[in-house]
């Protein structure tokens, strides 16, 4: 155990550094040792560093490939979506055209039906007007006939006297006798 502790004890006898400064003695600065260590680090570190850089490069290239594949997939999906959109737009246009033509047909049918209904309503109305006109004409004729009959009766009553009345009766009796004689 003594052998293990001896190097540490010997460290306690070394003089401590006086601080930072530049040492101009080449042998004390250990430039050769530093350059050897640096050369070894460069020689072995170069391989490690190049391996790290190659791994990083591979990861970046793989990420770029994956991104390009995802981009191609997205472009394919976009094209499919655009094609689907075009189909949907064509179908929507057809539906709109068909809908507009259907609306026009139904509008024309509705107008024709309304026109037919008006004609059907006009016929009874015209018949009613005609029958009302006929009834009015008949009433006017009856009133005119009654007035003419009243005037005629009034005129006859004012002009007829008893003598004319007796002569008319005699004349009518004579006509009846001749009619009876001709029938026998």
Curated annotation (Swiss-Prot):
The chain crosses the membrane at residues 31-49. GO terms for molecular function: ATP binding; proton-transporting ATP synthase activity, rotational mechanism. It is a single-pass membrane protein. Its main location: plastid. The keyword Transit peptide does not apply. Keywords: ATP synthesis, ATP-binding, CF(0), Chloroplast, Hydrogen ion transport, Ion transport, Membrane, Nucleotide-binding, Plastid, Thylakoid, Transmembrane, Transmembrane helix, Transport. One of its GO terms (cellular component) is chloroplast thylakoid membrane. The keyword Transport applies. It is found in: Plastid, Chloroplast thylakoid membrane. It comes from the Eukaryota. In plastids the F-type ATPase is also known as CF(1)CF(0). Belongs to the ATPase B chain family. F-type ATPases have 2 components, F(1) - the catalytic core - and F(0) - the membrane proton channel. F(1) has five subunits: alpha(3), beta(3), gamma(1), delta(1), epsilon(1). F(0) has four main subunits: a(1), b(1), b'(1) and c(10-14). The alpha and beta chains form an alternating ring which encloses part of the gamma chain. F(1) is attached to F(0) by a central stalk formed by the gamma and epsilon chains, while a peripheral stalk is formed by the delta, b and b' chains. F(1)F(0) ATP synthase produces ATP from ADP in the presence of a proton or sodium gradient. F-type ATPases consist of two structural domains, F(1) containing the extramembraneous catalytic core and F(0) containing the membrane proton channel, linked together by a central stalk and a peripheral stalk. During catalysis, ATP synthesis in the catalytic domain of F(1) is coupled via a rotary mechanism of the central stalk subunits to proton translocation. Component of the F(0) channel, it forms part of the peripheral stalk, linking F(1) to F(0). This is ATP synthase subunit b, chloroplastic. The gene is atpF.
